[in-house]
Amino acid sequence: MNMQNIRNIAIIAHVDHGKTTLVDKMLLAGNLFRENQQTGELMLDNNELERERGITILSKNVSINYKNTKINIIDTPGHSDFGGEVERVLNMADGCILLVDAFEGPMPQTRFVLQKALEIGLKPIVVVNKVDKPNCRPEEVYEMVFDLMCDLNATEDQLDFPVVYGSAKNNWMGEDWKTPTGDICYLLDQILEHIPAPEQLEGTPQMLITSLDYSNYTGRIAVGRVHRGTLKEGMNITICHRDGSKEKTKIKELHTFTGMGRQKIQEVSSGDICAIVGLEHFEIGDTICDFENPEPLPTISIDEPTMSMLFTINDSPFFGKEGKYCTSRHINDRLEKELEKNLALRVAFQEGYTDRWVVSGRGVLHLSVLIETMRREGYELQVGQPQVIFKEIDGVKCEPIEELTINVPEQFSSKTIDMVTRRKGEMVSMETQGDRVNIEFNIPSRGIIGLRTNVLTASQGEAIMAHRYKEYQPYKGEISRRSNGVMIALESGTAFAYAINNLQDRGKFFIEPQDAVYAGQIVGEHIHENDLVVNVTKSKQLTNMRASGSDEKARIVPATIFSLEEALEYIREDEYVEVTPKSMRMRKIILDHTERKRANRD
């Protein structure tokens, strides 16, 4: 394949602005699917979790052929918790498509990826999507994008970007948003015209490994873009590791991406993206070089983790009832496997234990996606409260600070500002957009844990919240966490409506009647600050004296159900979240009430 006929582009967009839909339509335009083949929606988000949350977690590669040119499309995760993924992926591209919603405009997370892309020097094409929505404002959004690029110090060449308007859902793109066209070829033509072809570099081969794939048959597969020279099947090569060591090995098979899949190929020349099968020991950031005189490429810098959690085996009374993998050996193997492909993750044993791990990552979302994935695979485990990773810089204790943007209706703005400042947030700017207010803060990562639930409650679910890591700054002082105590089950058994009904004035419950509970499990939130041990397993004594139906029937408020992130943000340091494939419970670490009292006294 001639180099002039390849384009490598990355797609940058905020969660839910239609990135994956756009790629679907590009695949259709490249006639990947036979006319009669049934295609699913969201072909790229092929991981169950991604479809449910509507977010892309892992980057995917697909390619289409258009006018004799191969376009490699690289889908990037939009969320800054997956920043480790984003940076490596951008290294494979020569240009990028910035996709923005015609109503919302560029969002904070988009800014994070765009900044990385402009720093590498990628040439952008801006696509204003969803112009079929009522009350959209494409012109204003275009201005906002331009201002954003200026803020991010884009070069003049980058600022001279083409704009495409359209609606990916309705399958059209054009240069004017008022006149729909019949297909998205206008966008593909812009890609061919404005995105530079990769440079053809002659010489000894070099390829930086930027992501991993795994196959049950062939093991780990290295994916990357050939930087220089050509790679051939069966060729002898040297792998230069990040730590400077070198290892001689051989390429078994080469694959390039075509459509949604891969095809086996004899050789790959510089500029194209390929997958190499048959290498044993390699990590992301290693370089594949010439056998005789290896010259490594500069490695990729990956953001350091900012948050850690304690993972431990499930030792609750309901241990092993629902999961397939419950032992420490299973969990350890699974975490080690995750380390191979999840770059921003770190795992270490807690000192003095072999069944407790400290797992560090980029944020609550990053770690909760891992827990959720493990849960679906049949693992049982318990997780402690998320802790922020402190650093000592020049003898000063420092903590990670994030940029937080909250968009709320005007009447809730003062409540929101009050909540954030109480958690040591500093307001940076505030602008009114119609009847909504956009407020920006700098806030410690500790302050964000548990903030989302509160802000959503205070704004009746209307707040839009986004945050991204900024830098380490000196420690900001104590932050008060959840102010209410919890209600703890007194003994194990089945919860009865009769008991719950009599306790409803003490707080709100997290369990329904007929749920199985165990002693020490958290069954609700107390109104006051102290914890309260309650007996929810007490049933009504029926005797001949009283007819069973004469009493008031129990009227029970529906239970509050937590998502995994909410539960992680809710618990205190003396509590765990127990995660099994079928259920999620919160519990005290010390289940026995007398022992817990004794521990609290010390």
Where are these regions (language model features)?
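P-loop NTPase switch module centered on the Walker A-proximal segment
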Residues: 1-106, 144, 212-215
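Long insertion/accessory domains within large nucleic-acid-processing enzymes
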Residues: 257, 262-265, 398, 443, ...
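Active-site phosphate-binding and catalytic loops of NTP-dependent enzymes
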Residues: 2, 32-59, 82, 148-161, ...
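Conserved nucleotide-binding/hydrolysis micro-motifs of P-loop NTPases
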Residues: 17, 29, 33, 79-80, ...
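Catalytic P-loop NTP-binding/switch module of NTPases
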Residues: 227-353, 376, 558
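Conserved catalytic-core segments of large NTP-driven translation/proteostasis enzymes
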Residues: 150-284, 288, 404-409, 442, ...
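Charged, conformationally dynamic linker/hinge segments
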Residues: 294, 302-437
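Conserved C-terminal guanine-recognition region of P-loop GTPase G domains, centered on the G4
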Residues: 96-158
